[in-house]
Amino acid sequence: MTQAILELNGIEKAFPGVKALDGACLNVYPGKVMALMGENGAGKSTLMKSLTGIYAMDAGEIRYEGKAVNFNGPKHSQESGISIIHQELNLIPELTIAENIFLGREKTNAFGGIKWSEMYKDADALLKRLNVKHHSRQLLGELSLGEQQMVEIAKALSFKSKVIIMDEPTDALTDTETESLFKVINELRDEGCGIVYISHRLKEIFEICDDITVLRDGKFIGERVVADIDEDTLIEMMVGRRLDEQYPRIDVQHGEKSLELFDVSGPGVHNVSFSLDRGEILGISGLMGAGRTELMKIIYGALPMTCGAIKLNNKMINPISPRDGLANGIAYISEDRKGDGLVLGLSVKENMSICSLDQLSKGIQLDHHAEVTAVEDFIRLFNIKTPTRDQIIGNLSGGNQQKVAIAKGLMTRPKVLILDEPTRGVDVGAKKEIYQLINQFKAEGMSIILVSSEMPEVLGMSDRILVMHEGRISGEFMAKDADQEKLLACAVGKTVEQNVEVTA
């Protein structure tokens, strides 16, 4: 068997109240893609931070190119040939693409001046390799989130590293961008680069990876060859049990209409009409840029409605701010939980109650007892894994952060719950828990809009599905009559025969 270029053996790391790593192991082989799998909180990110010197490990050994090493920080590991593409962007919007790629490593002449033309040329070559249709002189802030992620990847490639760690690299990418990334990964593999690929998207793991390492509760569970394992076995290794049904949809008798839109238009949205019943899950499908998030923000009041009308519980509303949306009984859980949904420097309690302070106050005084009681109730209900309600939320796993974001919306006691990519970056075990919670809200008569780029999720959880294309509704289906081919056809603007049951 090929000798590993990078070996992590018996790594241990503890934080107050929790042992994050307990004998974790990982081998990275030259010319191979190693998937690093595990539920949120399994220790994947902690292991990578221990490798690159962000965290000092408590025990264990790291060997790189056959020698024991102990990196004292990301700069040290990067200079040694190990690059990491973080899930959170580490870029500056006010700088150009080229400046971001070569920040701190600018090419200079004998007099200390920057060789701009050479730097732009090298940056353009990296962008071309990733099929990014922008010039490196363009400001980064003008790019979409997915395009910025491609710049982050270009930055990692610029180091010409021997090992590249990719943490959820396709999380914000379109299908086309993902294809471009996979093409580059295959090229890097052929060049002998060792790649660590961290993702919750099982389809990607089986498509692009050679081997799989699984962590659970900070422990090393096993290393397998991708060709020798199936999804069910992999999931069982990750969660320690078999998941009987991935999408536990329930049938609930729908109530009267709760939300109606009439020819609503706004930024990126054109003449959209639909209705939503109580006890119904309405799925919204479509490609990135189709206007799904923009439509949700118009309903919530985060974007302006330029024409049309919205009726909530038979009353016309015109939300012009998120405060209006909350006052009307609409809760919106953003697709960007770290940018819009949560304040990472605040505690679990503060994040969960931040939108419900009016309901939790007596006059002008916050009722701290009521706040603590409500927060503790949701921590138990959602099975949120946190040492205490006062834990800084940025220290929680992605799945637990997402549960807090959903709980924050539910504490406002909404009539309509909008979930925009609720399971993005969430592991299979936490997904199942979120689906069960969604079903519980549905059974209680709540109206739910589920926006998701994962077609199996939309098909598996929704009662009815709308498809958007270029800001318009391009298709409507009862979930039982839909499939991925129909949704994708509508998503790209093709005409598809649609079967929709009309409710009175």
From Swiss-Prot:
Domain ABC transporter, first and last residues per copy: 6-242, 250-495
Catalytic activity: D-ribose(out) + ATP + H2O = D-ribose(in) + ADP + phosphate + H(+)
Entry keywords, A to Z: ATP-binding, Cell inner membrane, Cell membrane, Membrane, Nucleotide-binding, Repeat, Sugar transport, Translocase, Transport
Gene Ontology cellular component list: plasma membrane
Pfam family, one: ABC_tran
Xref: InterPro entries: AAA+_ATPase, ABC_carbohydrate_import_ATPase, ABC_transporter-like_ATP-bd, ABC_transporter-like_CS, P-loop_NTPase
Binding site for ATP: G38, E39, N40, G41, A42, G43, K44, S45
Chief localization: membrane
Subcellular location: Cell inner membrane
SMART domains: AAA (SM00382)
UniProt-listed Enzyme Commission number(s): 7.5.2.7
Top-level class of the enzyme under EC nomenclature: translocase
Topology of this chain in the membrane: Peripheral membrane protein
GO MF terms, alphabetically ordered: ABC-type D-ribose transporter activity; ATP binding; ATP hydrolysis activity
Task performed by this protein: Part of the ABC transporter complex RbsABC involved in ribose import. Responsible for energy coupling to the transport system.
Family membership noted in the UniProt record: Belongs to the ABC transporter superfamily. Ribose importer (TC 3.A.1.2.1) family.
Entry-linked NCBIfam families: PRK10762.1
Assembly: The complex is composed of an ATP-binding protein (RbsA), two transmembrane proteins (RbsC) and a solute-binding protein (RbsB).
Name the UniProt record assigns to this protein: Ribose import ATP-binding protein RbsA
Lineage, top ranks: Bacteria, Pseudomonadati, Pseudomonadota, Gammaproteobacteria, Vibrionales
The encoding gene: rbsA
